[in-house]
């Protein structure tokens, strides 16, 4: 009796995909660097702590933080960020109609 040949999955010529975890973490790092140019670091730290408390230290929390940072940066750019090429050229923000609270001028 002959021994059956070992079975191997077919080899395709495509390069193996990297884990999605590394991609998500890379995107989060890029967004964090960009967000630090536009927002107060204390705000970003508080946001990160809130999301980690809500979702735990998981990939889901990283995805949620990416989602929130993308939205915040989008609104910030659309409001007329002075250091960005993206956004309105008028110079006014939609928040200029809101009066500044006393003691914050």
From Swiss-Prot:
Keywords: Activator, AIDS, Cell cycle, Host G2/M cell cycle arrest by virus, Host nucleus, Host-virus interaction, Modulation of host cell cycle by virus, Phosphoprotein, Transcription, Transcription regulation, Viral penetration into host nucleus, Virion, Virus entry into host cell. GO terms for cellular component: host cell; host cell nucleus; virion component. Residues 1-21 are annotated as: Disordered. The keyword Ion transport does not apply. It is found in: Virion; Host nucleus. InterPro entries: RetroV_VpR/X. The modification Phosphoserine is found at residue 84. GO terms for biological process: symbiont entry into host cell; symbiont-mediated arrest of host cell cycle during G2/M transition; viral penetration into host nucleus. Gene3D superfamilies: 6.10.210.10, VpR/VpX protein, C-terminal domain. It comes from the Viruses. The keyword Cell cycle applies. Stimulates gene expression driven by the HIV-2 LTR. Prevents infected cells from undergoing mitosis and proliferating, by inducing arrest or delay in the G2 phase of the cell cycle. Cell cycle arrest creates a favorable environment for maximizing viral expression and production. Interacts with human UNG. This is Protein Vpr. It comes from Human immunodeficiency virus type 2 subtype A (isolate KR) (HIV-2).
